[in-house]
Amino acid sequence: MSSNYALPDVFRAMAVLTGALAKAYSVLPNDSSKTSNASDVAEASLDVARAFEEASQILKTAVSSPVVARALSETQNNGTLHDQLNSSVQNIAKASTEFSAMGDIFKYQAKAQVSLAQIKACSNAQCSPETVESNFQEAIRDYEAASSIALQYGFQSLAEQLSDAVNQLKTALSNYEKTVATLQQIKQAQASGNYWQVLNLALSLASNQQNTQSSKNIAQAANNLKSALNAPLNSNNMSQYYSNVVSAIQSFPRCTQVSTLVTTTSAVIAIQRLLQLGSSELQKAQQATQALLQSAEQMWSSAYNHAEKAYEAFSLAEQLASQFVSQELANEIEKGLEKVKQFVAEAQANMNANKNILADAFNTVVDNISNAVNDLMNWVNDLIETHIPGIVGQILAGVVDGLIFVVISLIPGVGQIIDGIIAFSFISNLVEQGIIAVKTGYGAQFLQQLEESFLQPQNIAMIATSVIGGIGLERVLADRLPDIRIGAIDAAKEKIGDLMSDFKEKISIGLHGISDDASKVLDDIKTKIKGNAVSLRDVGSTIVEKKIEVKAPDITKIDVKPEEITAKNVNVKLVKPLSTDLAKQLSEKFKSVKNLKDLKAIVKVDKEFRIPYDLQGKSMGDKTVLTADYMEGEVLGLIKNYEADVKISPTSFEKTIKGAELKPPELHAKLSSFDYTGKGILDVEQDIIDAIKTSKDISLTSDGKGVAITTDKATTIVPVKKYFDAIMTGYAKGDFSDVKVAELLSKVNSSDLARLMTDDIIKKLKDYKGSGELKIGDLVIAKEIKGDKTLYSVAKIGPDGKPQSINVVSDIDDPMFRATVYNNLLDMVKNKTEFDYLVTNLNKMKSLSPDLQTTLDRLTVKPGERSISIEGSGGKYLNVTEKSLPGGSEIRAETNLEGVKAVDALEKELDGERQATLEQLLESYKNGGFRDVKALADALGKIDKLPDTLKEALAKYFDRKMENSSLEEEVDLIKGLPKMYEDLKTKVIDPVDTFLNKLKAKGAPESEIDALRQLFYKRVLNEINAGRSLDTIDLASAFVKANEVLDKVDDVVKDLKDRGLPDNLVNDIKASMFKQIEKDVLSGKPLDINRIEFDVLRQKEDAIFNFVLDKFGFDKNLLKNLTPDQLDRFKTNVVDQFLLKHITDKNDLMDEYNNIVKGPSKVQNTTQPSATQNTTTQPTAQNTSLPGATQNTTLPTPSKVQNTTQPSTTPNTTLSTPSTTPNTTTQPTVQNTSLPGAVQNITPKDLQSIVKDPKVLDEINATVEKLKDLGLPDKLVDDIKASIFKKIENDALSGKPIDINNIWTNILMQKEDAIFNFVLDKFGFDKNLLKNLTPEQLAKFKTDVVTDFMTNRIVDKTDLMQTYMDVKATVKGPGTTQNTTTPSVAQNITLKDLQSIVKDPKVLEQVDATIKRLKDLGLPDKLVDDIKASMLEQIKKDALSGKPIDINNIWTNILMQKEDAIFDFVLDKFGFDKDLLKNLTPEQLAKFKTDVVTDFMTNRIVDKTDLMQTYMDAKTLVKGPSTTQNTTQPSTTPNMTPPKIEFKDQNVKPPGTGAGTDVNTPGSGSQTVTSGSGLQLLVKPKEIAAQEEKIKLKDLQSILPEETLERFEKLPDSLKEKVIDEIETRLRGKKVDEIEGIVNDVIDKYEKLYDSAVKDGMLNDLKNLIDAYSKKDNNATEVLTDVGKSLEVLKDLNKSVGTSVVEEAKYNSTLQTYLAGLGIKDLNNVSDKQLIKIGTDVTNTLSEKFGTPVVVLTPEEAKILVKELNDTLNDTGLNTKFKIEEVKPLPKTLEVILATLGIKNETKQRILLKELQKKLPKIRITDLIVISSKGTITPITWDDIMPTYYTNVQGQTLPIYTTQTTTTHHITPPPPPPPPPPPPPPKTQTITTTTQITPPSPPPTPPPPPPPPKSPKMPASLSPSSGNAPSEAEAEQAEQVLLI
């Protein structure tokens, strides 16, 4: 059927199919410790199905192709050939149909594998029987369908095997159900201690075999076992009983799934009987010792006999336990043996003593042993109970794995090539793993046996269900494949080679024939495996004992002939020690060539090269001999790159194709025609040596049996053996050097020779590894590479620069041969995409015709040109053109392949030794030696596609393992990358996907999925960073954390829904929480769900507040009665109390309102005696004392926390106005007025909702009770309690760990003065005595009094006076404590003296431990000695006074005393800039000092970064009195600039002329920002009620590098303010070491935004939209028309906005999540429709954000919008080109818009409104603006109204309108044009405003300067006055009239 060579598509189909089949085999397990992944098998099955379908289509197309028609036509005159070809066509058509059917079969198989995967999953989980049964039934149905198709198309054998699989599944299901029931009975029997029942049930499981013979064998073994166990046992036959039991246990088959259970249970039964017998014998010995009228000697003799029997029984039981159960059990029995030995020794020693002593000793032994026996039985019960439950799952896993193996083995299409490998791999693995080998004994450990038996369940299940019968030793292949071309076989061999790679390190392959004995043994094995699965044990025994040789195919020895595919065989020695040699060789070779960059680039060419041929032919009968003259230029040398023994042999031309198989004399005669002289065959070694020495070329003859030695005079052919002998002889004589020998051997390279030279080759590779980098890609091979046979020669460039002659012989006259060659050449080239494939196949065709050019020339039908073109990936191409020339042809090749070089002679690149080395490398590559490179490349490709987090994790893991590795270890690591990837996939990717898919199936949104995925991947990266190994990573805890996250979010959502919040708001809160979760995970923050909930609820405060007011019908007009500060607190309190369910109706809401209204005035009257004299309104809340901001705050915002952390620090600090003198020393009133109020609002219930840990409140309550017991006043107790609550709340909300002891210490230090004064007053201490103390003594006395009082050491005035005297006596002088007093004290207190007083040695040990800790912290010796002396002095004092010694309390006291010294040391140690302390208030400094000392002592400050973080925390969280008491609306702190609000109102006096003075602005009132970097303030100036502390430039200069500051300065001025604004927001709550990254990120963002938005032209589109609204009149039709036009303009605007959002989203993960919510994931492919959708959503959101409750858009409100919109432009940086010039002062409701357009009639407005709402649902704020590119802002004035401004939580500055109120405003004029005169100082202006609002007409544009615009009246219909506006009923009536 050679005619198939004319059908290239057939071969292509075979290649596709063969590759898919080989890939399917790759999912098989390569050793018995691994199992196939069912999902991989399903995927492979789908691949095969697709391959069959593709092959079917290819074949269907092929039979109708022009090639087939031409072949049938041309062979009409040749009947035989025509019939053969026609038959082939029919067969291919039939194959097309059958392949389609096979595709369906494999589809069903894939479905079945999915069901099997579910069953396998049940082996690791607790699945219900119904689930398992359902999956079994699904698999059965799919296999039945596949079997039906196979039967329909005549695949009889395949149908039978599929039917067998169905039966096996049914049997497996039945066995599963029986096994579950039986195991339940086993557990019950075991629980009751009935081991006989356990054994019987286990034996019933073992005998449940399908195979009759197997069942009989097990049944017989079971009977033998039970007989041996139940045999009579007495003191005389113990040894025989033991021997019989051991023999029966060892004879029981080990191949069943319960064999270990049978073995263990049998041993336990026997042990139990032996222990009971031993106990009985001991009792008899005991009775003997109690017998009367016996001497001690008689007692001893009788007792000894019984004890000896007992010892024997215990000893046999111990041996059974050690051999079959557990070494632990054996050890316990050994203890009994020791007790018997002890008894014997005691008995012998007391033989002549009183017999009662003997009896007592015996009783003790017997009792102990009896108890031990009972304990042992209980222990065995527990052990078995632990391991029984897993058997069901393990059996299920085994059944499924067995079926996977069977089903894969059914894949047809590869034939004996796969058969042999599968047989070999299965048998060799079973032997290698010891599964079927005879074992002399079993493990001593019960757990090891159980693991060995059940952790390889595939072996159990395959045997138990007779699955072994289908392992593929008998292949089902109805029709053998037709001829397969070389390419297909190459593909098959490459894939099959992958299967062999795992075995190469276990076996040694020799090139020897297989013996008949080995063949027979293999046949026997096949028979046994097919017939009796249980006898595998015997099979393994035969293999191991006889060391016989089992045949397996050598992958390089394959013959391909028309009708068959056969494989030559080599012996495989299954002797494990032989495996190490080859494994070592392969490892060394791989290591030596790991620098080869591109193993495929063997031949490279210039971008254009030419192959000129000038050939002349000489006729020699039926042969053609060709020569090539010398020529100038370079010649392409083709590489022999094919398997040496592969022959393409069409039967009719077999002799020709094999080449000129001429005998040596005949070949000699042919060669003589080339002017060579032949001397015949040489027999003399010296002649051969001489010929070699003078040779020009040496090559192997075509038959591989001779060597052709070419000299100047002749070519001599000698046998290979003589050639080798001559080389060895010449080497011995010194004629040849080592290098020359290597070169000569390489000339005739063969597999045998390669193996002999392995060590030498390896050595050379190592040498060249060090001497120079060896890169095949840099070497252009112009020389033939020798193989086992030389079938051709090529021209090469000689030493003289000219090519040597070409000597070739071939027969190409036969027409059919010419057609075959030409068709194959084109077919192999035209469909391929790689250049090296062309080279490979051209070489293969040259093996058919030694001169390719002559072949092409002879085959040319028409003169002229023809070409072959190949297009590869990435635009690469290769064109080969043939042009006929006189006397020959020219081949011209053009390519654009990169990195190619001109052809160079090999001799110029390498010396002889390197040539040999390179040839060996290429030979290894050809034989698959570097196949691991492909697997490595595939793995790297997969790794590159991993998410960044996982990629980073894997890279760090790999880098860590590479550190300090040897070269060989590094090679193994690189080779292990595929395994690392699979571990990552198995351990991380697959489990995470499974978990998330379950969530997705439950309807979880994408935001949840993305956040959780990042959580898991971040967890993996953290574990890798922590040093964990991939194979130990366990995501179980991460899944638990994820569930906690989901549960918490669900709880929040449920609570919000329970409170009645609308769904859209609840969903918005939920989405915001997940966005924050994702952000925290990505940034590496610890996940604090409580903090996230708190932050999100604060963000949504306004929406929730409005909802509550509407829900309970609150009159919003009441809000006008509140000051901005009161409104802010009311809003916060309402939201908090509503969520905590404290507000449930309108009454509760009104109570909250009344509390706010009444509360602040009281505070004002107590803490601010002098109010501002220039204001007429009531003082606002922000003028009150500090605690006023927190009295009603349960869950405060961060800004509020900062203002309320420390209400008071020292008794010398008061909260007063600026006029208060600093000499005031009275006690503060804050403690008595404000903090109790805070306690009332921070309830334990509220705090518990934040803290979650119930122990915290218990500890607080205990502390408070202790304070009350000490008699402290209630107010002081409440003050302390409030401070503790506030500190806990702050720590919980900021994510810090809550340390009650630390908090208590800090609060105690803060309240020291108050407690001190209380104690002095309580015990009547004369405070005049304090004048006698130095400042140092007073400080120590104060600390000691408070500490001793709190620890009950001061209980009366005597104790107090003693403390006073001690302090006065011990603390001397004005200097610091550590420098003057305690060192001298320490000199007088020796440890010995102190120990004699203290008595307790642990006290001094604790002191030593404390001192050691101080030294470890690096404190100076002098300070440490000072602290030690102080501690010893206090200990001495306490000991002498009889007080209990409390080291912790003493340590706390000393720490407080030495706080200043330690604080200074820490600052100096870390290089802290002490100038920064000037920025702190006294309260902040006190907290900073305490925190520094505490955190340094507890290792929380370890570097400067930690110290700076503590500084920032103290600066942020603690506010001094001056930060609030001096603040009045709307003034600002000296470092802040108020908003520039400009008025063109003639009634407003210019700055500097008003009489009023801002209470916060002493002097001129001018407040400006100094020039320089905008980072000086880091915040945009805003006018807010409670100023927040800002990070100043000076703070940042120690953090930010110069490069960052320079980048900021280079920004456009218009962008700087926005950058600063965002930096402020993002720096809140951040650590110091995060600041630099955040600042750089913000600068990056705005640089990119600027470039993006300029290109978008967004402002032009926006302008078009505005222009559309400039032509409105009274005509409603025109209005509607304009609205329609505006909609089109609006689309353009929205598209532009959408484009900007998409561009920013490319580097903004938050926007990516937002767009994903809109269904847009591919940011590089967004349609116009999607862009419009994005823009619409964004502008809608912005419109909602800009909305305010004010009805009329006033000029001031217009200014706010100008500012907000210009800020929006700042976001994109477009403010340098465009600014919002004007915001039209139009009303914002649609009705008023219509009125402004000229439609005055209210009913008409309603009608038009309905029409507008249909077409344009929302009029946006942007619809009302006018844009100018002049860069100016034209403010609009309105004379009659002036709002009061306030700043809400979000930082928005909004107006509030009050009736007849006068407000003082701070006015800053705009800067005049350059050159600017000095600006006049700003002054205040009193303005009276009313609610009578009259909108103006649009201002005219007269020439400058413009007159003040007039103020037209508002239409009556729109006036807010209720007297002028028509009622709703009147409007409705008017509308009805108009409609009628």
From Swiss-Prot:
Residues 1160-1239, 1519-1571, 1862-1940 are annotated as: Disordered. TPR repeats lie at residues 119-153, 155-186, 480-513, 617-652, 1691-1724. Residues 1868-1883, 1895-1912 have a biased composition (Pro residues). Keywords: Repeat, TPR repeat. This is Protein ORF1940. InterPro entries: Formin_homology_domain (IPR051144). It comes from the Viruses. The keyword Flavoprotein does not apply. Residues 1186-1200 have a biased composition (Polar residues). Residues 1164-1185, 1201-1235, 1521-1539, 1561-1571, 1884-1894 have a biased composition (Low complexity). It comes from Acidianus two-tailed virus.
